Regions:
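S-adenosyl-L-methionine-dependent methyltransferase catalytic module, highlighting the catalytic core
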Residues: 65-70, 77-165
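Short conserved loop adjoining the S-adenosyl-L-methionine
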Residues: 40-46
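Class I SAM-dependent methyltransferase SAM/SAH-binding core
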Residues: 1-40
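Alpha-helix C-terminal capping/helix-to-coil transition sites in glycosyltransferase folds
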Residues: 47-48, 74
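Structural signature of beta-strand start/N-cap positions in the alpha/beta core
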Residues: 11, 48-50
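Short, conserved loop/helix-junction motifs that constitute active-site signature segments
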Residues: 4, 71-74
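A short SAM/SAH-binding and catalytic strip from SAM-dependent methyltransferases
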Residues: 50-63
Length: 165
């Protein structure tokens, strides 16, 4: 939000529960509401924003369906990013009998906040089943866009989507 405000003159709000992160937002002049993300969007009216962005958090929320529904209620479009559990190195670690640990999944199985890992196919199926139309998809691996077998070679997924009309 700090970058968007300074580079694009965008007015935005963050939802953050951690005290130190809320303080950092205030110190940087970023608008923030201290709340749990699971209930933080409820305080906004429908269609309050052009976009809602959820960056590398979708896999860590308890109620994925509720969050996506709320994102699409309060905005025209939503943008999410998440680590691709289908990335080949993640698959290989599972094949060897271990939960994946990588740049995008940096936690051990016992201390991870990630409770809903998904692949590109899983997320796209979720969108179809929950009335979300995908507008754009970018799959990245080490700052490069992946177009060949993205579910296998992409580390990080970015999706822009809207409510079905």
């Amino acid at each position: 939000l700090y970058f968007l405000r300074n580079s694009r003159d965008i007015r935005g709000y963050g939802v953050e529960i951690d005290d130190s992160n809320v303080l950092a937002c205030f110190n940087n002049g970023v608008n923030v509401i201290q709340s749990d993300l699971e209930s933080g969007l409820q305080s906004f009216e429908s269609d309050s924003f052009d976009y809602v962005v959820l960056s590398q958090t979708l896999q860590a929320v308890k109620h994925t369906e509720g969050i996506v529904k709320e994102m699409l209620r309060v905005s025209k479009e939503a943008i999410v990013s998440f680590p691709n559990f289908g990335y080949w190195k993640n698959r290989f670690q599972v094949m060897l009998g271990h939960m994946p640990v990588s740049e995008t999944l940096p936690y051990q199985w016992f201390d991870t906040p990630n409770i809903h890992n998904c692949t590109l196919g899983d997320f796209e199926q979720f969108c179809c089943q929950h009335g979300a139309r995908i507008l754009e998809r970018r799959i990245m691996s080490r700052s490069r866009q992946v177009t060949f077998l993205p579910n296998l070679f992409g580390m990080l997924a970015f999706y822009r989507f809207e409510r079905q009309k």
